[in-house]
Amino acid sequence: MSNLDEPVSSYLSAPEQVIVPMGETYDLSKVVETINKENAITYESSDPKIATVDKTTGVVTALKDGKVNVTISIEGDEYYKEGKTTVEVWSRDTDLWEPLTLEAAEDGWLGLNCWNNAQTEPVKFKVNDGDEQQITNTSYWLSLNKGDKVQLYSKNVALSNFNIQGVKCYAYGNVMSLISPDGNWYENKGINGYAALTYLFAWLDVKKHSTRELKLPATELAPNCYSYMFYNSTLDEAPELPAEVLATWCYYAMFSGCTSLEKAPALNAQTLAARCYSDMFAGCTSLTKAPALPAKKLAIYCYNYMFGGCTALTEAPELKAETLDYGCYNSMFSGCSKLNKVVCLATTNATDALGNWLAGAGTDASVTTRTLVRAEANTKWTNNDGWDWGTANWYVPTGWTIDPAIPAE
């Protein structure tokens, strides 16, 4: 090619958009077209936290759900000017984009039950990605073979009282597919309806899939939104709960009675609400370790009976709050018979905050020592098995050692 007085514009072409499943890679260099192929091409991601791209090879690695722009640049020379184009790359979390899915673990019947608000806007479903169908009765039963998949959809933000029961199954996909009015569940992070997903999996023989995840992605919660969600189910591992600002009663009894639950989710919320965690893990008799509770400002009855009856629990979370609120730790570890240590750094009490909080804790024959670790500034603790309603006593049961020891008067 002969030299030109002025270089001409580069020809650089690439798809407007590519989708890369989270955790996988995609080679952009294979879809980039240019005339001046000998000139160096470079790649740059607008947000490497979502998706990285190798600067020279163009290999994209999807890290977390989201969207980035990858800028593709080509060097100029005496014949061609520098050129640029942009590709929109979706790093897609497959489970976040897939609607709530129940996969039968064995042959049997799956029941879909609609009561009250769940009847005001239809719940729809597909079996094995077939035709969309609509639940027309209060109780609707599907005959499934092992491996059959049922996907569920609804635009009812106030769903409430929709319950799944029957055959043993794996649950994965995004629960927001049931309560997204615009059908855009993969981007919906807000629950707007009272008790929207209450009792959803209650009493169900439900298990965690070996490679898929059940997604509860909401960061904006509504009162009672997840209450009793897995009540008395066979769930063995809880899904992630990303919300950092809670609503009243939002997790009430969410996993209560899940006797197979061995692993609790991380609870990173800093802003609590009345009874937000009340009864959350009550009766989870296989749970041995409690999740950390980082919040330092408490709310009325926020942790009431949270771990009540967790007879296998040996590790309690550190209770960092200095100021207690009405009923905040009431019955929190009641019946945790294998618990042997609690760290409570509170210095200011509140009515009923410690009522019954360690009743029956550490009473198993395997427990040889029981220790309450206190804040050094708080010397009001005393061993006492009594509890009177409406008091603000610093009581820890007899048989528990207070550490550091309370100085003699």
Ranges and model annotations:
Residues M1-L4, W90-E409:
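Solvent-exposed loop and capping/linker segments of extracellular ligand-binding repeat ectodomains
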Residues S2-D93:
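Extracytoplasmic soluble-region selector
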